[in-house]
């Protein structure tokens, strides 16, 4: 093995390509196929555990592994390799007098990053490390491009996202984060399947009148054969509720959502959500279900109910406190809740709040809120002043949403100015949004019409009028509750990831000039 330190990347690639040719000259395909490992590194480590060297030496049979070389310590006619497969890292001991002259010539053409196969018995070295002592050794794939930073990891964060295939290899903890993400998704599936929910798939391409279910701008595309303008879905809600009308009383969908909006540490234009709907249930039922789901996921994914996010311990043990959006939002403006919803003194209160706000963007939003409905203004005040004050050490349900904020939610029987809705917050993030569903077709039609007026007034996130959805409600949708959970933010919480890009394998990035 040649030392690559101080050599340019182009020179390293040229050297490695020469080694690939040398392998071919030895009769070894540097990109061959045919080695099938029979074991994983984790199996060897678990099987022998703390056994002493004498006991390991008596164990019958060989181990057959394959993986990527992370490091090499060479001592002339012997070497120790750090090899990682999908389960763990393991030391492999290659000795000329064990593998033979031909295989050792192959070994001498090895580079860090190559993928190798090795077979032989387990042993314990003088330093006490469990090791595979190779009797058979070969290079399976020659890595012609070197890994960065000599295995100290990628230092350019954006490069990590652009070259996730390298990031997964060299950056500690990245692979584990995505394994946890996969366990979150499978855990949600098991949780809902066990409760009689049916997983379904609904369209991702929507006609313009169908592109609703959330307050967001959609991406637009065109179907050439049908000469049809289409939009990528911003939610699965309206199609899933159509299925409830059709008699599928418990349904869910895990899938991709696209929203043409800004990018920050909590938002990516393409993300994954789970939406589920249950007939003959209320938002109160879903609160209890959500508490149970969060607690179960925490135990399954992290080993206990307490997770740590950016240094803050968060206990996911139920029950979770409730915080009133109406009460907190109105009080933040110096108004009584009834006065705020009626608009009494609201414009002046918004102006005062804007004047004392240090953040210029939030100040501008507060000034503009005077043009919106009172309910929307209260919701904005809660977002700016209330959300930062939510509990830090446990999740919280935000309740008491004004009617104007929720065009698809059921009015509260005891107070029609509000809707039966909640949002779940933890670690300063909205993780879930749920409500008792509006199933009155006349009320839904009126709210769609209000959304159309808002769109005509310049609100790009207002929902379109979905006549077919109203028609579905006219056939009768049973009392229903539904919820959406952001998988990516949930993964952020359970993996202690500060940015959503850290839990999306290939996040959207600007093109490099």
UniProtKB/Swiss-Prot annotation:
GO terms for molecular function: ATP binding; lysine-tRNA ligase activity; magnesium ion binding; tRNA binding. The gene is lysS. It catalyses: tRNA(Lys) + L-lysine + ATP = L-lysyl-tRNA(Lys) + AMP + diphosphate. Mg(2+) 2 binds at residue 430. Keywords: Aminoacyl-tRNA synthetase, ATP-binding, Cytoplasm, Ligase, Magnesium, Metal-binding, Nucleotide-binding, Protein biosynthesis. Homodimer. GO terms for cellular component: cytosol. Its EC number is 6.1.1.6. Belongs to the class-II aminoacyl-tRNA synthetase family. The keyword Ligase applies. Its cofactor is Mg(2+). The keyword ATP-binding applies. Pfam families: tRNA-synt_2, tRNA_anti-codon. This is Lysine--tRNA ligase. One of its GO terms (biological process) is lysyl-tRNA aminoacylation. It is found in: Cytoplasm. Its main location: cytoplasm. The lineage of its organism: Bacteria, Pseudomonadati, Myxococcota, Myxococcia, Myxococcales.
């Amino acid at each position: 093995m040649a030392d690559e330190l101080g050599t340019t990347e182009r020179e390293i690639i040229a050297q490695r390509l020469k080694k690939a040719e040398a392998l071919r000259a030895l009769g070894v395909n540097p990109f061959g196929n045919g080695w099938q490992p029979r074991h994983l590194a984790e199996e060897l480590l678990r099987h022998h555990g703390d056994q002493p060297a004498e006991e390991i030496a008596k164990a019958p049979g060989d181990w057959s592994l394959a993986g990527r070389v992370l490091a090499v310590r060479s001592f002339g006619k012997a070497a120790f390799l750090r090899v990682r497969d999908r389960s763990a890292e393991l030391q492999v001991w290659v000795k000329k007098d064990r593998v033979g002259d031909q295989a050792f010539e192959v070994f001498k053409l090895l580079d860090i990053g190559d993928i190798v196969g090795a077979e032989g018995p387990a042993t314990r070295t003088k330093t006490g490390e469990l090791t595979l002592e190779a009797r058979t050794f070969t290079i399976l794939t020659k890595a012609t491009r070197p890994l960065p930073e000599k295995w100290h990891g990628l230092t350019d964060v954006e490069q990590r996202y652009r070259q996730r295939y390298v990031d997964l290899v060299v950056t500690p903890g990245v692979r584990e984060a995505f394994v946890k993400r996969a366990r979150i998704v499978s855990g949600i599936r098991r949780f809902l399947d066990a409760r009689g929910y049916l997983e379904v798939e609904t369209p991702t391409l929507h006609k313009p009148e169908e592109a609703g279910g959330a307050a967001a701008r959609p991406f637009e595309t065109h179907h050439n054969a049908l000469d049809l303008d289409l939009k990528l879905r911003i939610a699965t809600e309206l199609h899933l509720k159509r299925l409830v009308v059709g008699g599928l009383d418990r349904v869910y969908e895990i899938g991709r959502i696209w929203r043409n909006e800004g990018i920050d540490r909590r938002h990516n234009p393409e993300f994954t959500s789970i939406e589920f709907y249950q007939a003959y249930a209320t938002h109160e039922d879903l609160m209890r279900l959500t508490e149970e789901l969060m607690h179960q996921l925490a135990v399954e994914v992290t080993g206990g109910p307490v997770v740590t996010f950016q240094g803050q311990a968060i206990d996911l043990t139920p029950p979770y406190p409730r915080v009133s959006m109406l009460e907190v939002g109105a009080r933040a403006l110096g108004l009584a809740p009834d006065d705020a919803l009626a608009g009494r003194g609201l414009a002046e209160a918004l102006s005062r709040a804007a004047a004392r706000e240090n953040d210029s963007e939030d100040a501008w939003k507060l000034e503009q809120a005077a043009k919106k409905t009172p309910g929307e203004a209260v919701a904005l005040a809660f977002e700016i002043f209330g959300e930062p004050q939510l509990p830090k050490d446990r999740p919280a349900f935000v309740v008491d949403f004004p009617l104007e904020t929720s065009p698809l939610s059921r009015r509260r029987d005891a107070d029609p100015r509000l809707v039966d809705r909640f949002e779940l917050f933890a670690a300063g993030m909205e993780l879930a949004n749920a409500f008792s569903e509006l199933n009155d077709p006349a009320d839904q039609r009126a709210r769609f019409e209000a959304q159309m007026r808002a769109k005509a007034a310049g609100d790009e996130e207002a929902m379109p009028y979905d006549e077919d959805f109203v028609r579905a409600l006219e056939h009768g949708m049973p009392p229903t509750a539904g919820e959406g959970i952001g998988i990516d933010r949930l993964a952020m919480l359970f993996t202690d990831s500060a940015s959503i890009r850290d839990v999306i394998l290939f996040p959207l990035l600007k093109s490099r000039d």
